[in-house]
Curated annotation (Swiss-Prot):
Residues 488-495 are annotated as: G1. The keyword GTP-binding applies. Residues 592-595 are annotated as: G4. Residues 254-286, 296-353 have a biased composition (Gly residues). Pfam families: EF-G_D2, GTP_EFTU, IF-2, IF2_N. This is Translation initiation factor IF-2. GO terms for molecular function: GTP binding; GTPase activity; translation initiation factor activity. Residues 49-370 are annotated as: Disordered. One of the essential components for the initiation of protein synthesis. Protects formylmethionyl-tRNA from spontaneous hydrolysis and promotes its binding to the 30S ribosomal subunits. Also involved in the hydrolysis of GTP during the formation of the 70S ribosomal complex. It is found in: Cytoplasm. Keywords: Cytoplasm, GTP-binding, Initiation factor, Nucleotide-binding, Protein biosynthesis. It comes from Bifidobacterium longum subsp. infantis (strain ATCC 15697 / DSM 20088 / JCM 1222 / NCTC 11817 / S12). Residues 538-541 are annotated as: G3. It comes from the Bacteria.
Length: 986
């Protein structure tokens, strides 16, 4: 079926293409645009994901619909008053207790059961709204509801308590009798001071019939004329308060005091704005204004002295002629009071009163955050202390990665590191030592994840378990051939032994007669009439191929140590023993060249005993076999010993039915086939068409070849095979595995590349400390020989680079490999060498004609080698030639002064006899007087023989010497001439 495109799927799913692209990204699929195609399995997964999301979305409303709704507050109509308003002397009707408002409806103002409905005062015209009674009550009721909705989320004001207070403040005294509050609970809990005079009470009763009393409503939203509408309703003519014509402030009237401080007021009220109770606070709208129906800034009072509903704005302790907080005003003299409290609406000239609760909350939150910061200040920055917590970072991590983990600023970490004596940028990769120093200072235990753990975590993201082979059942395991590595010193006959076993002649094709790459072969031998397969790995014996020998020891099951009977144990023999013992691999010793004159196999046995290889005839457990690979003597006994050792000490079984896994033995770049990797399958079976990942290389297996170049369809465990189809040349020793598809293989390879690049940067970018700053400047003056290495195989390039980096000539010169690669020398290599003034080394590779012409035009030197030790010798000689020359002083002549001639034009002229050597004009000289050098830095400015100017005078001749302006010479002085000659450095 055809592959669907993204926009087509978006149409089918009834979503836009952007949503589909984001969903694909979340699923781990990388799609470029909406017109890109995707695989049918991915499309099915995508549809399933959308179906799952839709199912989740449908279940949410259903679940929410099942929740019971909050029980509404029961609305009750207010009961009719028990007596008409005219009967003021009748007993008051007790008010029913207010119902507790539920949290769901805390903002609703339910009328109190049993409370009387507000009625117009006598004298008001029927049908006309009385100011401060019905119209003001209704409009302000709406404004208060709006305000309560806005202030519902403020944490600093308790909603439930405030709403209850507002409801209770609406209570009016029944039958016109002041002092009877409608909320019994509030009256019982709030302290009420005694009335300080009866005049106030009587005056309050008289005034209650003439002047309408304002209701205790919510605070005014604000009166800033420069701001937009602040929640206030549009006033109607009946709502506009009219000042009393006789309202004038008296001298004794005072303003309300600060809430929370007892004053001189008559009653006990509570400020409305801010929700904080105030002691006293009976101030009216303005001091001494009678008849003003606008609630003042004083708190509510309880009638005249003790009664009255609480209401009004938050205010203070005023008393006297002011409004009594919504109660009856008193006609008596003002009782004084303090200054008005904080709060109030924002005015035209800025906000008055204290800061808002939001600002207080932010200040408290900042204070809390400040107290949480317990780390010491380092360099002016404050970083939270980790208290020894452990944090894991990847290899090559930077300060930016650490800052993201512990949630601090990157610049702060840079500052701390600078004060610790280290200089690094926020994005620079750091090593483990620097992270440990920084972590110890800020209280964090920083650990860098090893490369193996990081790779294991990466593979687990793609459902690949590297420990799967340890969890195999015994029924799934089947026998596999042993992997045998042939190791030993160079020219001891390793490749000759393999040629004899395979009946081939590989050694004739090796440059210089030495092996410079790992060869993998599989042969079939007969053991007791039964055919058995053995996989052989031939490792180089030259000292430059240490990494190859170590790699071969890690991949092998049994090691054959080849030792020449005439040479005995050599340095690379000891190294091979150490590699095998480190890998815990059993060793079978093959004493070769027993047919050569001077061969002494017993000497070899005695030498190897010192390294823990004791022969069986000496009471040990190591098998020794005397062979001659050239004459094919006892080779069959050697193979028999290998198989017996493998059967006795090893469990050679593997599961051939799982996905293939193994190691890359060798890799090269073929001109016609591309990247060719020789791999050894260790688990499972590798098939043509599998998607594989080898290190940072990936691809699909296009073809597989055996060691003879014959195509193969499948390769089982312990089978060496050449794989074609990789996008790049992998590194020798990289593990390979089979991925689920090409996309997963590419993602694994790309993430490995990023990890490897970061690790290399961490090693290359050494953090410069302040103490080493001068040292780094001195190192910048070192002459570096830049080299570009190109070779035919990955292992050869690696071995050549390691060998060149080990060359130590002097501290004044060094080697820097700016690029290395596998394959022919390309134009990019020449361009890179041109910029960096580098030398290109071609190991078994050549450039084409165009690249060679370009290198000649640019003056780039290309050196070709086929044997590794010749390349090492030439580079070492080049480094010695780069050394700065050293000079030493060489005495050339001695001349005795026998006469002094004085000249007004030239000064003193010494007549000398040359005793030895040759005197030359312009050479340096010194004066020796009685065997002591009086003056050193002199120069022979003129040299004459009689009247002729000469260049030199030899031994036994007389001459006249003028020393320029120096005239302090005496008879008998010796003029010694010398030269500075360059000395060859070693």
């Amino acid at each position: 079926m055809a592959k669907p495109r993204v926009y087509e799927l978006a149409k089918v799913l009834n979503v836009d293409s952007k949503t589909v692209l984001e969903k694909l990204k979340d699923m781990g699929e990388f799609v470029k645009s909406a017109s890109s195609t995707i695989e049918p399995p991915v499309a099915r997964r995508l549809k399933a994901e959308f179906a799952k999301d839709n199912a989740k979305g449908d279940s949410k409303p259903a679940s929410s619909a099942q929740k019971p709704a909050a029980k509404p507050v029961q609305q009750r109509r207010p009961a009719a008053p028990s007596a008409p308003a005219s009967t003021s002397s009748s007993a008051p009707t007790p008010a029913a207790p207010a119902r507790q408002a539920s949290p769901a409806s805390a903002h609703q103002q339910a009328p109190t059961p049993g409370a009387p409905t507000p009625r117009p005062q006598g004298g008001a015209r029927p049908g006309m709204p009385t100011p401060g009674r019905h119209g003001q009550h209704d409009n302000r009721e709406n404004g208060r509801d709006n305000r309560e909705g806005r202030e519902n989320g403020r944490q600093s004001r308790p909603n439930d308590r405030r709403n209850n207070d507002r409801r209770n403040n609406q209570g009016r005294p029944n039958n016109g009798q002041p002092g009877q509050h409608q909320n019994n609970r509030d009256n019982a809990s709030a302290p009420r001071p005694h009335a300080q005079g009866g005049a106030g009470a009587n005056g309050g009763n008289a005034a209650s019939n003439a002047i309408p009393r304002p209701h205790a409503q919510g605070p005014r939203p604000g009166n800033n004329p420069f701001s937009r509408k602040q929640g206030m309703h549009t006033p109607t003519p009946g709502d506009i308060p009219r000042p009393h014509p006789m309202a004038r402030p008296t001298a004794d009237s005072g303003r309300g005091g600060r809430p929370g401080r007892p004053g001189q007021g008559q009653g006990q009220g509570r400020g409305f704005r801010g929700g904080r109770p105030g002691q006293g606070g009976q101030g009216g709208p303005r001091p001494g204004q009678w008849g003003h129906n606008r609630p003042g800034q004083g708190g509510g009072s309880q009638g005249a002295g003790q009664g009255g509903a609480r209401g009004g704005f938050r205010g203070g302790q005023g008393g006297g002629n002011n409004f009594q907080g919504g109660g009856a005003p008193s006609n008596g003299p003002a009782r004084g009071g303090g200054r008005g409290g904080r709060g109030g609406a924002a005015g035209a000239f800025g906000r008055q009163g204290g800061k808002s609760s939001k600002a207080r909350k932010n200040r408290l939150a900042k204070r809390h955050e400040y107290e949480e910061l317990k780390a010491p200040t380092i360099g002016g920055v404050r970083i939270p202390n980790g208290n020894g917590q452990t944090i894991r970072l990847r290899q090559g991590a930077s300060l930016a990665d650490l800052a993201e983990k512990i949630n601090v600023n990157q610049a702060a970490l840079v500052t701390v590191l600078f004060h610790l004596g280290q200089m690094a940028t926020a994005t620079q990769s750091l090593d483990e030592e620097t992270f440990q120093i920084l972590g110890g200072e800020i209280g964090w235990n920083i650990q860098l994840v090893s490369a193996e753990e990081e790779d294991k975590e990466l593979l687990q993201q793609f459902d690949i378990n590297l420990d799967e082979e340890e969890l195999q059942d015994d029924e799934d395991l089947k026998p596999r051939p042993p992997v045998v590595t042939v190791m030993g010193h160079v020219d001891h006959g390793k490749t000759r032994l393999l040629d004899t076993i395979r009946k081939t002649n590989v050694i004739a094709r090796e440059a210089g007669g030495i092996t410079q790459r790992i060869g993998a072969y599989q042969v079939t031998v007969n053991l007791e009439g039964e055919p058995r397969k053995i996989t052989f790995l031939d490792t180089p014996g030259h000292e430059a191929f240490t990494a190859m020998r170590a790699r071969g020891a890690e991949l092998t099951d049994v090691a054959i140590l080849v030792v020449a009977a005439d040479d005995g144990v050599m340095p690379q023999t000891v190294e091979a023993i150490n590699h095998a013992q480190a890998a815990k691999v059993p060793i079978v010793v093959a004493v070769n060249k027993i047919d050569v004159p001077g061969a002494n196999p017993e000497k070899v046995r005695g030498q190897l005993t010192e390294f823990g290889l004791v022969p069986e005839e000496y009471g040990g457990d190591t098998m020794f076999v005397d062979i001659s690979a050239k004459q094919n003597l006892h080779v069959d006994k050697l193979l028999e010993a290998v198989l017996l050792t493998a059967d006795a000490e090893l469990d050679l079984r593997a599961n051939p039915d799982m996905d293939a896994r193994g190691a890359t033995v060798e890799a090269r770049l073929d001109k016609g086939r591309g990247a060719v990797a020789t791999v050894l399958v260790q688990q499972g079976t590798l098939h043509v068409g599998d998607a594989i990942v080898a290190g940072t290389s990936y691809g699909r297996v296009r073809a597989m070849l055996d060691e003879n170049g014959q195509p193969m369809e499948a390769a089982g465990p312990s089978t060496p095979v050449q794989v074609l189809g990789l996008t790049s040349v992998p590194t020798a020793g990289d593990l390979f595995l089979v991925a689920s598809d090409d996309r997963a293989a590419r993602q694994i390879a790309e993430k490995r590349q990023a990890t490897e690049r970061a690790a290399q940067l961490a090693k290359r970018r050494k953090v410069v400390s302040l103490e080493d700053f001068k040292k780094k400047f001195a190192e910048s003056e070192i002459d570096m020989l830049n080299i570009v290495i190109k070779g035919d195989s990955s292992g050869s390039v690696e071995a050549l680079e390691d060998s060149l980096m080990k060359i130590e000539v002097s501290d004044e010169v060094g080697i820097q490999v700016i690029h290395r690669g596998v394959g022919a020398i390309t134009q990019n290599d020449v361009n890179l060498a041109t910029v960096d003034k580098a030398v290109i080394i071609g190991f078994n590779v050549r450039p084409n004609r165009q690249v060679a012409d370009l290198a000649e035009r640019e003056g780039v030197e290309i050196k070709y080698y086929s044997v590794i030790y010749r390349a090492i010798e030439d580079i070492e000689a080049s480094l010695k030639g780069m050394l700065k020359p050293e000079y030493e002083e060489v005495v050339t002549s001695h001349s005795e002064i026998r006469e002094i001639f004085r000249s007004s034009k030239f000064g003193n002229i010494a007549g000398v006899m040359v005793q030895d050597g040759e005197v030359k004009r312009g050479t340096k000289c010194r004066i020796l007087r009685n065997g002591v050098a009086t003056v050193n830095d002199l120069e022979i400015s003129s040299l004459r023989r009689f009247k002729d100017d000469v260049q030199s005078v030899k031994e036994g001749y007389e001459a006249g010497i003028n020393l320029g302006t120096f005239n302090d010479i005496e008879l008998g002085d010796i003029i010694e001439t010398f030269e500075m000659q360059e000395v060859e450095r070693k």
